[in-house]
Regions:
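Glycine/threonine-rich flexible loop motifs
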Residues: 99-108
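Short, glycine-/small-residue-rich phosphate/pyrophosphate-handling segment
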Residues: 125-153
Length: 258
């Protein structure tokens, strides 16, 4: 029997998580464990908690919320505390409310759950559902249908990537899906805003917010294809070295030392 570990960054109460769990339990004869944050941890990136203790709070059978833990905490602690004799065959992080594309991957708690898994040697996928502001509620039907196929593919054929690599998968907004595209991550144009306010005691505070979801115009990027109605699958590697720049930096350093 296969074993699956599930986490997310929208908290243990999120709709995307609940529907993912329901589908996996129905479609796969697998032992499923869920460890999710107790509260929403969107944009927490790959942070782990080192300054205070964490505890599992049981929600249901093999279902735990991690008290004030991040997605990376959830995966790390699950692998080291809950799995005694055998590690999971797959870690799934999601389904996130909102896309995780381009450099937003570096901010994403959803992607961080998958990152922590592959750092620990476990194959992983990150799932995110794009939606438009006009949509009153998210429709996960297409996401669940395609996730089922991807998980089945992994179990039948093995994981397609190497060590410290995961699949970042984004599903388009509610519409007829045009297909699936394997593509690169886009390039984000960042224009964050900081909104200033004064609290009742006269102290200034700020709310951070992204003004617009703007990206560079690249036809073959995840965001461009996602907006056109395609499911995007981007292989992500954790090796951040810019190998093609090493000679340049070596020459630069040598020139500065002469």
């Amino acid at each position: 029997m296969k074993e699956i570990l599930i986490t997310n960054d929208d908290s243990f109460e999120s709709e995307g998580l609940k529907k993912l769990i329901k589908m996996l339990k129905k479609e796969f004869k697998a032992k499923i464990t869920i460890v999710a944050p107790a509260t929403e941890k969107s944009a927490c990136s790959h942070s782990i908690t080192l300054t205070k203790p964490l505890r599992f709070i049981k929600v249901g059978k093999r279902f735990y919320k991690l008290d004030d833990g991040t997605p990376a905490d959830c995966v790390y602690l699950a692998l080291h505390a809950l799995y005694k004799t055998r590690l999971p065959d797959l870690v799934i992080s999601g389904i996130n409310k909102g896309a995780n594309v381009g450099e937003d991957i570096t901010y994403s708690g959803t992607c961080a759950g998958a990152m922590e898994a592959v750092l620990q040697g476990i194959p992983a996928i990150a799932l995110s559902q794009f939606y438009k502001k006009s949509e009153k509620e998210l429709d996960f039907k297409n996401a669940l249908k395609i996730t089922k196929k991807i998980v089945q593919n992994i179990f039948d054929k093995g994981f397609p990537l190497g060590k410290k690599e995961f699949l970042n998968i984004n599903f388009p907004a509610k519409s007829n899906i045009k297909g699936i595209k394997i593509c690169k991550a886009g390039k984000r144009v960042y224009n964050f805003e900081a909104h200033s306010n004064i609290n009742p005691r006269g102290v200034e505070y700020y709310w951070l917010a992204a003004a617009n979801l703007d990206f560079e115009d690249e036809k073959d990027s995840d965001i461009a294809l996602l907006k056109k109605g395609y499911v995007t699958i981007t292989p992500i590697m954790l090796d951040l070295s810019a190998y093609d720049k090493m000679k340049k930096v070596k020459k630069w350093l040598k020139a500065n030392n002469e």
